[in-house]
Amino acid sequence: EILIGLVGSEMCIRDRLVLDQVTDPQNIGAIIRSCAAFDALALMVQDKNSPQESGAMLKAAAGTFELLPVCRVTNLSRAVEKLKKEGFWAVGMDGYAKNDVSALQKGGKLAVIMGSEGAGMRRLVEETCDLTVRLPINPEVESLNVSTAAAVVLYELNRK
């Protein structure tokens, strides 16, 4: 898998974003743009449940598609386990988590995992997480769009 080459890279001090069954190409394009803007190392998606490159995705990525490696993997849980063996902390985003995203230590090797807007992370993927965190949003608002949440998380991790 492409993952092996990227995991072994010396550039792995930056964060990765992992998407679990995010299927909207415009959301993925916007997430690619945010990853590029906030200097994430790579985006990882499951091959089977993620859209292929399309005009809608490229348009939403706004010229940043070539700036970010997109790793397509067969088994997301196993791929996250491989990242953990390479020293990454697997951090799942969960609106009901006790810990706030601002409590994460910056500068480490993080693999931030985000699930689909409807179902969130699948159980097996969530079980690979070392911890889960949430974005502190108004309790009257159920959630954010996944691409918006990704941008906020990447910004928070990129702050000095």
Region locations from a protein language model:
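Hydrophobic, well-structured mid-protein blocks that either form specific transmembrane helices
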Residues: R14-A62
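Structured adenosyl-cofactor binding patch, chiefly the S-adenosyl-L-methionine
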Residues: A36-A37, L58-T64, R123-K160
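Short, conserved catalytic or interaction motifs in soluble domains
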Residues: A40, G95, A103, I137, ...
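Amphipathic alpha-helical repeat scaffolds
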Residues: T23-I31, N75, L144-A149
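Histidine/lysine/aspartate-rich catalytic loop segments that bind and position anionic ligands
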Residues: L41-N99
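Single conserved hydrophobic/aromatic residue that forms the stacking wall/gate
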Residues: E1-G8, C12-I13
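Short beta->alpha connector loops at strand-helix junctions that form conserved
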Residues: D20, Q46-D47, L68, T74, ...
